Amino acid sequence: IKCHNTLLPFIYKTCPEGQNLCFKGTLKFPKKTTYNRGCAATCPKSSLLVKYVCCNTNKCN
């Protein structure tokens, strides 16, 4: 799977074996700003400050 791994939408990388999810972390406030992106084996848990969304198709994050 290929996932974006920077805040720039045109940069991505091929994920290592076993990491079959892409994630995007978004700050919940003040403006729902994208915080980080990358590959993961399991979806990171959201917190009070950051909401994580995961997907399993190329460049979906």
Swiss-Prot record:
Family annotation (Gene3D superfamilies): CD59 (2.10.60.10)
One Gene Ontology molecular-function label: toxin activity
Tissue: Expressed by the venom gland.
Keyword Hydrolase among record annotations: no
Disulfide bonds: 3-22, 15-39, 43-54, 55-60
Keywords (A to Z) from UniProt: Disulfide bond, Membrane, Secreted, Target cell membrane, Target membrane, Toxin
Primary location: secreted
PROSITE patterns the UniProt entry points to: SNAKE_TOXIN
Cellular localization per UniProt: Secreted; Target cell membrane
Pfam families found in the cross-reference section: Toxin_cobra-type
A GO cellular-component term linked to this record: other organism cell membrane
Family: Belongs to the three-finger toxin family. Short-chain subfamily. Orphan group XV sub-subfamily.
Described purpose of this protein according to its UniProt entry: Has low cytotoxic activity.
Further comment: These two sequences have Gly and Leu at positions 25 and 27, respectively, instead of 2 Met that are found in most cytotoxins. The low toxicity of these 2 proteins may possibly be correlated with these changes.
Record's protein name: Cytotoxin homolog 2
Organism name: Naja melanoleuca
